[in-house]
Curated annotation (Swiss-Prot):
UniProt superkingdom: Eukaryota
InterPro entries named among the record's database cross-references: Ni/Co_transpt, Ni/Co_transpt_high_affinity
Gene Ontology CC entries for this record: plasma membrane
Name of this chain's protein: High-affinity nickel transport protein
Covalent S-S links between cysteines: none
Ranges per topology, Extracellular: 46-50, 116-136, 232-239, 404-439
Sites carrying sugar chains: 408
Organism: Cryptococcus neoformans var. grubii serotype A (strain H99 / ATCC 208821 / CBS 10515 / FGSC 9487) (Filobasidiella neoformans var. grubii)
MF-aspect GO terms: nickel cation transmembrane transporter activity
Coiled-coil regions listed in the entry: none
UniProtKB keywords: Cell membrane, Glycoprotein, Ion transport, Membrane, Nickel, Nickel transport, Transmembrane, Transmembrane helix, Transport, Virulence
UniProt topology in membrane: Multi-pass membrane protein
Amino acid sequence: MLSRWTRRVNESRLAQRKLTLLGRAIALVVGELLFNAVCWIAAGICFGKTDGILGLALLAWTIGLRHGLDADHISAIDNATRQLVSQGQLPITCGLFFSLGHSTIVIVVNVAIAVSVDIYDKLDRVGSIGGIVGAAVSASFLFLIACLNIYFLVGAIKQRRSMKRRQALGLPPDEDEGDPSKIYGGGCMVRVVGPILRAVDRPWKMYPVGVLFGFGFDTASSIALLAISAIAQRGPNGDAISHGKIVILPFLFTAGMSLVDSLDSILMLYAYATPDSTSPEGKLALLQYPDPNYKDSYLEETVATTLPAEDGQTERHVIEPIDIPQGETEGLETEDNIKAKTGNEILVEEERVGGPSRVDGSGGVGNERVMKAKANTMSSLSIILTLLSILVALSISLIEIMGLIGDNCTQCQDAANDPDGGGLAGSWWRAWARANDQSGYIGAAIVGCFAAILAGWYGAKWGKKKWKARRDANAAIVLEDNEDDAAETPVA
């Protein structure tokens, strides 16, 4: 009887385990690798006996890897991740949904070619219009998302300065301080960026953004050309390749691009919202276990009562204790960090959050993750990375706009293609064209800069921690030696 009860308790506890941020990141990468493996196994089965087709499959996969490093991809994922983190989310799948949206266009085009090869002849006409639409959407999205992050950055810096100033004066946090995850006011800037914030407030909403980015049909045309080349190949018996098999090529492209974009999304998330090592999310573990003592430690002091009203204020009520399922306490404070909060302490905490705390029936404190996100977005590292991402987004947006103008302006084309160089105008437009052509290298450089900044930052923190520990140890030894010398000195 006892063993059965124990087994049920353990099974219930195991069922309530949740993946940590590290666990979700590893699960995402493992899923991507499995998808890549499945695509390659399918390619080997379909094309293994045909000379040259596996080479085309490898080319499609490497095109996906390289395209995942395009500067517009990196900048869009980076800025969208920063925006969602400022809203209290941990969006680990931004890159995945973006790449899936972009790949949808490639897959649809190649499926159409598998149905009718004549579709390829019409891609040029569609691609000329789609290229303009895709570049315009990409540049506009990057520009608007950069403006939105400028708003968040300015708000975070102002609030950080205000908090430090009030803390130095020994004053409580100002209840009028705005939450950087929200947009207040009614000015022109708010009217412009407000709909953008509401439009992309979940990671899955990066999927339609990726679809719009894919309207350029540049990668779709490249993979379609590989598909046409595969159809032209002959099998060992001289038979033509089945048209249905070429659909594997866009899936290989999708596998490569989604892998790179997912890794980029994970890197950006850890850059902006590295969890505290003392929290369940920040521990080096794949799963976080429910704390059986957590519920009582959190709720034992939240007795239903009414706080006395201060002068000029209405009565404020403390949150009544409700049953919070242990499996849904993700993002709450740990037991060691929980303190009894009554009276003015609760009011101060509410001011610090930017509004009254909210406990809903599904469990969890609604503003807890926003509080942590605010702390993350106001850190020095986050401010540096946000500034870098804004500059990158504005730069990539400018490059794409100038490239779009250069491709569709007759005078610009004449100056760029002038045999005599075209003077200053020719050099100007050729420079923008070269910048567009080097998008993959620019994207790789952006990722490298973020990785270098992260490595340098945490390396410096680790070195500083070790230096302080060594200094404190030496000071303790010197103090102990002085005490021993004082004890051995005879009293006159």
